[in-house]
Curated annotation (Swiss-Prot):
CDD domains, per the entry: RNase_HII_bacteria_HII_like
Keyword Cytoplasm appears in the UniProt entry: yes
Cofactor requirement: Mn(2+); Mg(2+)
GO biological process entries: DNA replication, removal of RNA primer; mismatch repair
Gene name in the database record: rnhB
HAMAP family found in the cross-reference section: RNase_HII_B (MF_00052_B)
Gene3D superfamilies: Ribonuclease H-like superfamily/Ribonuclease H
Taxonomic lineage of the native organism: Bacteria, Bacillati, Cyanobacteriota, Cyanophyceae, Acaryochloridales
Keyword Nuclease in record: yes
Name of protein: Ribonuclease HII
Function: Endonuclease that specifically degrades the RNA of RNA-DNA hybrids.
Length: 214
């Protein structure tokens, strides 16, 4: 398996920017839970790990193993999140930008950021290059996607112990048939995004019939 390229990182390293940071998020499309972002700064002389890919292309076991290896390889890693309340208040796009900004703040100072996706005019970033499909083309962004995915999945697994009805240890908050069936049966928890589930809101009796596990 050929390792992902460092061509984007090298373009800035060659300009004298040593702290180039890859940024990615996970959880934008979920019905429950926060959106989480990771920022990863790699050493200029780093050798890409061959297995690193977009986190969606890896198994949970592969991600867990690479998570530890990336932490060992990186100069700095920052995690940022935006809560369900923030998502409902400002919308998922702006909440995602908040999560990314918080992740970047935890690896400051940094010289230039490579961010997965396409940024809108409301993005609160400077010194940034947005790369569509960045987690498939940039090694540092792919590393960030793995870190963010593992951190969020572990958080949702902990929440699943409190709300076992929703299968969050398996679906991590995405709208799978299992999750939607549980919503029909038990209603919303405090961890569900009301702005994503407006059709379930009219009946107050339908709000959180699930009893948290002790």
């Amino acid at each position: 398996m050929e390792p992902l390229s460092l061509i984007y990182e090298q373009a800035y390293w060659q300009q004298g920017y040593s702290r180039v940071v890859g940024v990615d998020e996970v959880g934008r499309g979920c019905l429950a839970g926060p959106v989480v972002a990771a920022a990863v700064i790699l050493p200029v002389d780093c050798v890409p790990l061959p297995e690193v890919r977009d986190s969606k292309q890896l198994t949970a076991r592969q991600r867990s193993r690479l998570f530890a290896q990336i932490y060992h390889q990186a100069i700095a890693i920052g995690i940022g999140s935006a809560s369900v309340a923030e998502i409902d208040q400002v919308n998922i796009l702006q909440a995602t930008y908040r999560a990314m900004a918080r992740a970047l703040g935890r690896v400051a100072p940094w010289d230039h950021a490579l961010i997965d996706g396409k940024l809108t005019k409301t993005a609160p970033f400077e010194r940034v290059t947005a790369i569509i499909g960045g987690d498939r083309h940039s090694y540092s962004i792919a590393c960030a996607s793995i870190i963010a995915k593992v951190r969020r999945d572990r958080f949702m697994a902990r929440l699943a112990r409190r709300y076992p009805q929703y299968g969050w240890e398996r679906n991590v908050g995405y709208g799978t048939p299992e999750h939607r069936q549980a919503l029909d049966q038990y209603g919303l928890t405090p961890w569900h995004r009301r702005s994503f589930l407006k059709s379930l809101l009219p009946s107050e009796a339908h709000l959180c019939n699930a009893i948290p596990a002790e």
